[in-house]
Amino acid sequence: GRGEDAILDRITFRKIRMDHVMTPFCANSFYFCDPDGKTAYVQSREVMPVDERTPAMKRFEFSDIEAKNCHVAASYFEGLPEKKIEEIVMKNVSVSFAENAKSGVPVMSEGVETCSKRGLFARNVTKLVLDHVVIEGQVGEKLELHDIDEKIVED
């Protein structure tokens, strides 16, 4: 939700196996299931002033994870334009898609298009580290990166 007390930091996922999930990795600053989630303020992609209503998404780490037979997207990360997700680290991550993948929206947010077999999407992130990240079977680009300040990709 919105608010300066809404802080996500040091979120770590490690040694996980997933099968037949829609979008295995997501962090979404425009979540619409809170009471104010569908208001113009929450859903606006315009730069807003940073004030007591501004949440913070800081560090996320995903390591040693296999997600197979996925459907919608390999990942969907979207921070606020005025307060980006500070850091996302993905290390030793493998994503593959189901042959007959279902379509859906990758996150609960207005204005996000339905898709299937989409690659890794990230917008409004200060630092993105992709260390031995494998994505197989996607339709279109493996990486859709927008407004990323620092990107480190290692095979």
What residue spans do the PLM features occupy?
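Extracellular/periplasmic carbohydrate-active domains that bind, remodel
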Residues: 1-155
